[in-house]
């Protein structure tokens, strides 16, 4: 795991007190007329830094005045997670914010969005386009299907987060509403909307989701995870 757990109020204060940044990458031609401050990184004819620090440098360009600005946020309070030390498979295009915990051998697929304070257990897969809202918790060896949503709760600070147990399978495009707990070993059918807590070892389906059966050998076989996909 990679981060120190924060409760809702601590996350709110983290965001409120964070320096808001508009990070940019600027490729320019010509010579800078002024020295580069320590807050800006210059590599050849490329500048990296906050726009408020980079913009004055561009105004002082001499000779050619051509430059291209690349940016992906404005006044952002929470940076993206530094993934270099995480012992998991994270595919291109996943958006993971800072203060997220990711367990060993987890898998985060393309297009997944994971907000601040979320926790992902070891061996769990977050499939393509799935969304884990703020403080959402998923246990070990679970699978959150493509397009599924685990609602987040940063505000109100008193609200309880979504908690998903171990060995849970959440089907594609399912939605789990704020504060709901999914018991270990259970299955949420594709497209279900879960508005109430789900006990362990059951299958729920529908809108709103209802228990349709207990887990049996056939269900376990159909929903078994593939360890090979979690090999690093």
UniProtKB/Swiss-Prot annotation:
GO terms for MF: tetrahydrodipicolinate N-acetyltransferase activity
Key word Hydrolase present: no
Enzyme class at the top of the EC tree: transferase
EC number: 2.3.1.89
Pfam family, one: DapH_N
GO biological process assignments: diaminopimelate biosynthetic process; lysine biosynthetic process via diaminopimelate
Keywords in alphabetical order: Acyltransferase, Amino-acid biosynthesis, Diaminopimelate biosynthesis, Lysine biosynthesis, Repeat, Transferase
Pathway(s) served: Amino-acid biosynthesis; L-lysine biosynthesis via DAP pathway; LL-2,6-diaminopimelate from (S)-tetrahydrodipicolinate (acetylase route): step 1/3
Reaction(s) the record says it catalyses: (S)-2,3,4,5-tetrahydrodipicolinate + acetyl-CoA + H2O = L-2-acetamido-6-oxoheptanedioate + CoA
Keyword Repeat: yes
Superkingdom as given in the UniProt entry: Bacteria
UniProt cross-references to PANTHER family, sorted A to Z: 2,3,4,5-TETRAHYDROPYRIDINE-2,6-DICARBOXYLATE N-ACETYLTRANSFERASE, ACETYLTRANSFERASE
Biological role stated in the UniProt entry: Catalyzes the transfer of an acetyl group from acetyl-CoA to tetrahydrodipicolinate.
The family this protein is said to belong to: Belongs to the transferase hexapeptide repeat family. DapH subfamily.
UniProt name for this protein: 2,3,4,5-tetrahydropyridine-2,6-dicarboxylate N-acetyltransferase
Organism for this UniProt entry: Streptococcus pneumoniae (strain CGSP14)
């Amino acid at each position: 795991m990679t981060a120190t757990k924060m409760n809702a109020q601590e996350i709110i204060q983290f965001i409120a007190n964070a320096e808001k940044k508009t990070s940019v990458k600027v490729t320019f031609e010509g010579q800078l007329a002024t020295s580069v401050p320590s807050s800006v990184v210059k590599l050849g004819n490329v500048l990296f830094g906050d726009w408020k620090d980079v913009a004055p440098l561009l105004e002082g360009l001499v000779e050619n005045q051509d430059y291209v600005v690349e940016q992906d946020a404005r006044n952002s309070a929470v940076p993206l997670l530094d993934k270099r030390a995480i012992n998991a498979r994270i595919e291109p295009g996943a958006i993971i914010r800072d203060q997220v915990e990711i367990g060993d051998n987890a898998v985060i697929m393309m297009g997944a969005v994971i907000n601040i304070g979320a926790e992902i257990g070891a061996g769990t897969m977050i499939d393509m386009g799935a969304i884990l809202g703020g403080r959402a918790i998923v246990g070990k060896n679970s699978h959150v299907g493509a397009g599924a949503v685990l609602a987040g709760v940063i505000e109100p600070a008193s609200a309880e987060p979504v908690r998903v147990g171990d060995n849970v399978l959440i089907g594609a495009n399912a939605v789990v509403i704020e504060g709901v707990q999914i018991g270990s070993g259970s299955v949420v059918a594709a497209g279900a909307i879960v508005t109430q807590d789900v006990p362990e070892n059951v299958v729920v389906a529908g809108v709103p989701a209802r228990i349709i059966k207990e887990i049996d050998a056939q269900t376990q076989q159909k929903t078994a995870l593939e360890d090979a996909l979690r090999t690093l």
